[in-house]
Amino acid sequence: MMMPEEKVRLLSMMEVLESLSQEELKELSQRVPDTHVEKGRIFYTPEEKSERLFMLKKGRVRLYTVAPDGRELTLAIVDAGQVFGEMALTAQQLRGAYAEAMEPVVVCAMSRNQLEELVRDKPEVGIKLISILSERLSLYESRMEDIGLKEVPARLASLILRLIDSEGVMTRAGVKIPNRYTHEQLAAMIGSKRETVTRALGQLQDLGAVEIRRRKIHITDLGCLERTATLGVPSKVV
C-alpha cells in the first residue's frame, strides 16, 4: 500500500498538475485513489465510451489503433508523469485508440465531472491539458505522414529521433534509449512488420548511425540518423 506522502509526490510529477500547490495535491490525492494494473491490461477500446482522464504514476502505457488488415499501429508511448484518455473528454470524441499497460503500472483516474471542477478552480490545468492534446494530435499526424511518405528505414530513423527527445539518456559513449523495444514493438510504432524492421535496423547499423548493445539502441552518429530520417538510406546501402 502506498503511503499518503508518496501519493502526493507522484501526483506532483504530473505535467498536467504542475500548477497545483502541495495542499491542493494532497486534497486531490484523497479524491482520486490509485489503481495497480498488471501488464497487458486494456484500459479502453474505441468501442467504449469512457469519460475518464488517466494519470500515469508508474510504468508505461501504449496507445494504439488497429488497421483494417489487423496490424497494430502504436500512436504513442505514455510514460510516468503523463496522462492519457484526454481525447475521450473532448466534445468530438476523437479517441479511436486502445490503451494497454506495457508493464505493471499505477494509475489514478479523474471523471469528467472531477476534471471540470478542477479546471474551474485552476484554469491553468485546462490550458495545460489543451497543450497536451495539441501535442499528441501533432504526434499522431506526424506518424501518419511518415507511414504515407517514407520508406521503413527513414520511418525507423524518425522514430528513434522521437525516442531520443522523449527518453534519451546521455552517457560517456553518447546518447542511448534506456527502454528496451522488441523489433515487433518498433514495427507497431512505424506501421511495418517485424522482419522489415530487423532489416532496416541492420541498415542503420551499417550506416554507423546506431548500435544495439544489450538490446538497447545507442546512437553513434546523430547527424547520419537525422539525414536518414529526411532522405532515407543511400542506394548503395539498400
Feature names for model-found ranges:
Residues 120-191:
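Polybasic "coupling" helices that flank or enter modular domains
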Residues 76-134, 138:
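Cyclic-nucleotide recognition modules
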Residues 25, 115-116, 225:
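A generic structural signal for short hydrophobic patches within well-formed alpha-helices
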Residues 19, 53, 77, 101, ...:
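Short aromatic/basic micro-patch
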